[in-house]
């Protein structure tokens, strides 16, 4: 992942650059119509509008879509430090339905971060402030091969 060289000394600019770089190639988040609203190191807020094609058989937003929204916020937050991280586990609790046309927000916050792992909480809310879901994700640093073949 390459980032703005100017951002190296500024954690907020580094976070914004890292998240923008990840979003540019994230077809799933783009397909959801996800918008990045706010970025800081270890914290990201994203929003989307529930579309008719996102509804389940009960006429409410499918749980998998809510999970994908939360997972995207989690991914952006754990990658906001400029280190490549991937999900190692996640769980979600659904608390209220979201309907077609509603705007939903996922706010991801860093709970714990080490050189190799991180824990992030994501709260998904409606524009009314009602909580739709709570998500917790665990990430691990992506091991990348260098040109010499060494694993970092």
Residue ranges: model-predicted function:
Residues 1-152:
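Terminal targeting signals and extreme-terminal segments of soluble enzymes
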């Amino acid at each position: 992942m390459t980032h703005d060289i100017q951002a190296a000394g500024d954690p907020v600019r580094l976070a914004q650059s890292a998240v923008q770089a990840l979003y540019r190639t994230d077809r799933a988040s783009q397909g959801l119509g996800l918008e990045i609203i706010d970025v800081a190191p270890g914290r990201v807020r994203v929003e989307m509008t529930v579309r008719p094609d996102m509804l389940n058989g009960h006429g409410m937003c499918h749980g998998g879509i809510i999970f994908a929204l939360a997972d995207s916020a989690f991914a952006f937050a754990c990658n906001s430090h400029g280190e490549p991280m991937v999900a190692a586990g996640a769980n979600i609790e659904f608390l209220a339905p979201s309907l077609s046309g509603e705007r939903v927000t996922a706010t991801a916050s860093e709970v714990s971060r080490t050189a190799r792992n991180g824990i992030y909480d994501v709260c998904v809310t409606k524009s009314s402030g009602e909580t739709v879901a709570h998500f917790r994700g665990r990430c691990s640093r992506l091991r990348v091969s260098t040109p010499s073949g060494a694993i970092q």
